[in-house]
């Protein structure tokens, strides 16, 4: 007799719960061996409500280490989620996007921090494109006393993008020089929009202060000489293949447990070889 939909559902949930237990056992046995932890977040619907799924991976091996549901993406919430995992595994480096909350988490946990270059490049390219368009089409007035010009700003935007993309050996000093050039750009008055000079002041200062997080991979080496590639692509791929791919065929989840069970089941099977015994999941 064919299985009913409810029987299939129950079997998948039970297998997912078992996959979570197996993964937790596997992670416990890797204490001290996972030096670089990638984290990222995605959103799915549960009974029509937005639900945040947090995902942690081993950047060097590509293994999915944890799936969890969190209330928000604040530093406090993320730190509460990831602290125990980092301590248990003795993680050295956190790899993530460039959200301020994640910088705080890395600092609070005493971890080295690598920002995802792909994510940063996209964000910086968009910001520079917007500033460049404004400077070309409807530039703000440039105060005479600043010693700056629109042409100078356009040149500096190009230089900034080249620094962020190319990560030259003297990137820190180049960024410091740019940040110094715009440090006198005045902040906007109440209810006014920030000028293009002030926006570039913030942008150059931000990357001057966070250069080490962007270029960390150039110097970091694992215990056995492992290298980072400077991206969080591993975690993004896990989200795409283990969380989002299944979600696309559904109209949403009904329970938080279902989100974790299904993602964990797919994630666990994805880590196994072609001869894996599925009987482990029964």
Give the residues covered by each predicted segment.
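RNase H-like nuclease fold core
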Residues: 2-95, 100-108, 112
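DNA-recognition alpha helix
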Residues: 1-2, 242
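Acidic/histidine-rich catalytic cores and adjacent linkers
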Residues: 99, 144-282
